[in-house]
Amino acid sequence: MPRKKVLVVDDSAFMRKMIGDMINSDDELEIVGKAGNGQEALEKIRELQPDVVVMDIEMPVLDGLSTLSRIMESQALPVIIFSSLSQKGTEQTLKALQLGAVDFIAKPSGQISLDVLSVKEELIKKLKVAANTSRKLPVYQSLHEPVVKAKKSLPDQDRKLNKLVVIAASTGGPKALHQVIPRFPAGIDAAILVVQHMPPGFTRSLAERLDSLSELRVKEAEHGEKVLPACVYIAPGDYHLKAKSRLKGTENELYIELDQSKPRGGLRPAADIMLKSVAKQFWSHIVCVIMTGMGNDGAAALPCIKEKKGRIIAEHQSTCVVYGMPKAAVETGLVDKIVPLSEITEEVLSML
């Protein structure tokens, strides 16, 4: 099998060399070219026809977001973004994922030559996944900012919780969540818990961005807080999200528990952990959604959801950036509905 062709785009000659050496060390990938800015990258893409691009965001001449937008308009080539861990960097990364980037890797800080090598395994794994995704990836957003929703009132702390939606996603998930969460109407009588595989810092930016676009209140989950209807709680990076029920008078209440117990399958947060916890602790109706992502996180916990008479939705392969997690879910034989991304919110509402 021929090696997958990779184009490296970064304005730092040092970074281009480091990334190139890492990629060329793998026998399934090869560097076919390097570019120092976005304009040069577009020219190299036309000339070299790479299978996948790894690209920095902050570059001269033509920045990464503008370059990515043009790539998506022309051929939807799979792109992996190198992102900084700064606040600006996390926000730019989320915009890149909305524009159509397949995934991202957080640029390490500190002693750069040693730290860059620490991401080698992650880089190679994600490049291989990206190189094998469809080139006809759907593009849902443009560089223009989406409409920001009006400020929401504070949630009613005494409102009874009778329904729960749990969502799991990985690669392609941030973009998919931007299509699902803002479509929920204000005042729904369910809370939504989300596990999206992302590093620390990125989940907070994701929650803030979704909150600005949604009628529901969206936030990064905090340890010990009460789970309320019409609110969305996103598991913070590097923490497992669990549910804990408590009896208050004659009524049950649900609370968030966060911990840094052992990663499951290398993942923290892990959907399996959240789903099993919810199935054990929640006393009423559960709807579970497994969306785009590599691997099989979530599938092992589906029998627990079914034991509680929960309903399960999997995203259809046609709209997945990576058909891994939904495929594993479908293969359990426990999924009730398989629907494209555009129909997930409507399907969830019909099951509540």
Curated annotation (Swiss-Prot):
Active site as annotated: 170, 197, 297
Record carries keyword Cytoplasm: yes
GO molecular function: phosphorelay response regulator activity; protein-glutamate methylesterase activity; protein-glutamine glutaminase activity
Source lineage: Bacteria, Bacillati, Bacillota, Clostridia, Eubacteriales
Ranges where the CheB-type methylesterase domain occurs: 155-352
One record GO biological process: chemotaxis
Compartments where found: Cytoplasm
A Gene Ontology term for the protein's cellular component: cytoplasm
The record's account of how the chain is modified after translation: Phosphorylated by CheA. Phosphorylation of the N-terminal regulatory domain activates the methylesterase activity.
Domain notes: Contains a C-terminal catalytic domain, and an N-terminal region which modulates catalytic activity.
Family stated for the protein in its record: Belongs to the CheB family.
Record keywords, A-Z: Chemotaxis, Cytoplasm, Hydrolase, Phosphoprotein
The keyword Hydrolase belongs to this UniProt entry's keyword annotation: yes
Chief localization: cytoplasm
EC nos: 3.1.1.61, 3.5.1.44
Gene: cheB1
Protein name, as recorded: Protein-glutamate methylesterase/protein-glutamine glutaminase 1
Domain Response regulatory as annotated: residue spans: 5-122
Reported function: Involved in chemotaxis. Part of a chemotaxis signal transduction system that modulates chemotaxis in response to various stimuli. Catalyzes the demethylation of specific methylglutamate residues introduced into the chemoreceptors (methyl-accepting chemotaxis proteins or MCP) by CheR. Also mediates the irreversible deamidation of specific glutamine residues to glutamic acid.
Reactions listed under catalytic activity: [protein]-L-glutamate 5-O-methyl ester + H2O = L-glutamyl-[protein] + methanol + H(+); L-glutaminyl-[protein] + H2O = L-glutamyl-[protein] + NH4(+)
Sites bearing 4-aspartylphosphate, chain numbering: 56
